[in-house]
Regions:
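Short, well-formed alpha-helical segments that are part of the catalytic scaffolds
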Residues: 12-25
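Acidic donor-binding segment of Leloir-type glycosyltransferases
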Residues: 24-59
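C-terminal subregions of glycosyltransferases and related glycan-biosynthesis enzymes
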Residues: 26, 172, 179, 192-290
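Flexible acidic/His/Gly-enriched loops in nucleotide-sugar-dependent glycosyltransferase catalytic domains
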Residues: 53, 63-74, 93, 97-155
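Cell-envelope/extracellular polymer assembly enzymes that use nucleotide-activated donors
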Residues: 2-5, 32, 172
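Short beta-strand-to-loop acidic/aromatic patch adjacent to the donor-nucleotide binding site
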Residues: 80-91
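Short acidic donor-binding/metal-coordinating loop in glycosyltransferase active sites
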Residues: 62, 87-89, 117, 169
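Conserved nucleotide-sugar donor-binding catalytic segment
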Residues: 131-204
């Protein structure tokens, strides 16, 4: 069975305990857990220690060493073939880990898998979905934040080694670098409730994976708001400029549609404000290039 390393930030001990409890019920599914801690205290170690008899779990203390936090996590997940950066907003369904493993085994040439969290619950009305249901509602075709991506670790290692200066301080940039350098073709797999349905259109893959990873760069962040000390307008402006850089041929309407889809699922990003900030950012960029 494929081994997946789930990397969890130790931001809130109650949330950490709940997430580890969910994973402990799937201990025979073939995975291990890495708790990433920046607090400098023993709290996360104590919580993780309570689950060591149920599953493979360890805690890594992150440092201000100049390396991106995600890279420190990746180094600590030594030997892991697949990694999933699991943010606290994501709740695992009972069969999700096994389903991911089966999809990876069935499609060995793919490097990135999308884990469609909402699919098992489409039969439930919104108000009666099980407690702890993933708190963001996606329309058909929408894509979850990076925490629903399972990524081949070697893709990240090779991309970082090829151009560490271009990696920035977040995972979105290094994945973008992996696409540009052609180290591997980041393939896409939607893990659905039923049979997996590969999406092989390169243009669709390029747009969806890179745009949404670029968005994550300016959203909540893996380790929380303290890593992104910007108000909503500043984040939206940065996001707009990032999208314009990645996709110079995109029209304003295309970019606005992308931004509005994110505004639906991200609390601070309200549609009208998002659209107006994006329009202003793109206008400023066009003027600077004129």
């Amino acid at each position: 069975m494929i081994e997946i390393c789930f990397i969890i930030p130790a931001r809130n001990m109650d949330t950490l305990h709940r997430t580890l409890s969910m994973l402990s019920f799937q201990k025979d599914a073939g995975f291990r857990v890495l708790v990433a801690d920046r607090s400098g205290t023993e709290a996360a170690h104590d919580v993780a220690a309570g689950f060591e008899h149920q599953m493979t779990v360890e805690t890594v203390d992150l440092e201000n060493s100049g390396l991106p936090l995600w890279k420190q996590c990746l180094d600590a997940a030594r030997g892991a073939e697949w990694v999933c950066f699991l943010t606290p907003q994501v709740d695992l369904t009972p069969s999700s880990v096994r389903r991911m493993s089966r999809c990876i085994e069935d499609h060995p040439s793919y490097d990135i898998f999308h884990w469609n969290l909402t699919a098992p619950y489409r039969k439930y009305p919104l108000k009666t979905r099980p407690a702890g249901f993933f708190r963001r509602v996606f329309r058909e075709g929408d894509v979850a934040p990076i925490s629903s991506f399972v990524i081949r670790a070697q893709v990240l290692r090779e991309a970082f080694a090829a151009d560490p200066d271009a990696a920035g301080m977040d995972l979105a940039v290094i994945l973008s670098a992996a696409r540009k350098t052609g180290i591997r073709s980041a393939r896409w797999e939607r893990i659905s409730y039923n049979a997996p349905a590969p999406v092989d259109d390169p243009a669709w893959v390029e747009k969806d994976v890179r745009a949404r990873l670029a968005f994550f760069r300016w959203s909540e962040g893996f380790f929380g708001e303290e890593d992104y000390p910007l108000d909503t307008g500043e984040r939206l402006t940065l996001y707009a400029n990032e999208l314009a850089r990645l996709y110079p041929s995109f029209t304003y309407e295309e970019l606005k549609a992308d931004l509005n889809s994110f505004a639906v699922v991200s609390g601070p990003f309200r549609k009208m404000r998002a659209a107006s900030v994006l329009k202003a950012a793109l206008k400023a960029r066009q003027e600077s290039l004129a």
